[in-house]
């Protein structure tokens, strides 16, 4: 039994305690792609036809879309190999030219050897080997943000590895720091459905947090089953909670996370999800800068230069 491709939908939250309180939460979505099965079971290609135009759109936009769809037949909504509103473009992940200089040189070298021809699965396995000393013995599922209207943006992607008994065994976070456009990877082992893990911060992400801090992870992977349908066999799925706490010598500084429920990825779930959030990449970036504006201008949280340390 394998893991199905899924859409993970729910909420992301941020809560700052120091130096001032600041909280927000937004709807969020990850596409959960089974990298192990991707060659034999690619993502479905989903198109929109005139009858699929959402009723809640403004009248002028509905008329324009219906006219365009009648002329061009379809608008691609999801694709793995061609341009679409949402495209799974493997080159968007593990971008070697954006690795942070603080990342282990062995990882840089090992990832640089097969790129760009190596599959995303191989790159994830190599990264785990370097960061944890082992690789998953079962399937690997990527929790990623897809390219949206030809443009890729994601603050973080996650990769979950499973053992031969379908139990969570490995975790990898691909972190991007928006202002500086660099990436870093944190990897550690999972101990079943709930794992707590802590380590020193090794990558400057927020311009409002110093570098000498500690991360406290809580990763929960709750398995479930999807019933067989349309001659497809029963498949595994999961819901996920990923919570990251940040501490330093002042105490608990910050907390962020996602709580997401999985639905099997098929044409119906893709249509529904995209109708709800057609432009998630753009809204995510706008929200990041809006919250940064409120922190810096309205709440006077001091700016932290790249790799700036908190005075001891």
Regions found by a protein language model. Give the residues of each.
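Mature, function-bearing regions of proteins
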Residues: 1-312
